[in-house]
Amino acid sequence: MKASERLLKYAVIYTGSDEDHAEQTPSTPEQMTLAQVLAKDMRDIGLTDVSVDAHAYVYGFLPATADREQCPPIGFIAHIDIVNEFGTSEIHPQIVKEYDGGEIALGTSGRTLDTVQFPDLKQAIGKTVITTDGTTVLGADDKAGVAEILT
């Protein structure tokens, strides 16, 4: 599975933080739901000893490459909670294929992205860009990291 496919799979699972329960981890049941999905995906790609603890921390292990067992281990860490900005739990990713460098309308929300406000968009010309439809956050800072780690 490609990282973009994983991002789309994970993005639609709403994991907004609940400020009323900020003292507990996870602060919402949906965060545990995504943790369970991640654990399954980790098992599916061959990680071993995969587990999810009571706080929605997901652990998995990948054995060292043969003849590299002496190398130091490495760990990858990412979080799965997102901001709760729009007060809705329905996340609608939007895919722009072969981005042409112009303004990207975020669905019918009236919001847009452009290279004046976001100059880094110029690097995406000709590529696929994944955004929200403008009615919610995408949560890509968290979930794209997780998707990349598992790809």
Language-model features, listed with the residues they occupy:
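Predominant activation on well-ordered alpha-helical scaffold segments within soluble catalytic domains
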Residues: 4, 8, 36-39, 146-150
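A non-catalytic alpha/beta surface segment that caps or lines the substrate-entry region
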Residues: 22-71, 75
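N-terminal capping segment at the start of a domain
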Residues: 2-28, 131
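A generic "functional-site adjacency" signal
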Residues: 1-4, 54, 143
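Acidic side chains
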Residues: 14, 41, 53, 81, ...
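Active-site metal-coordination/substrate-binding segment of hydrolases
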Residues: 68-151
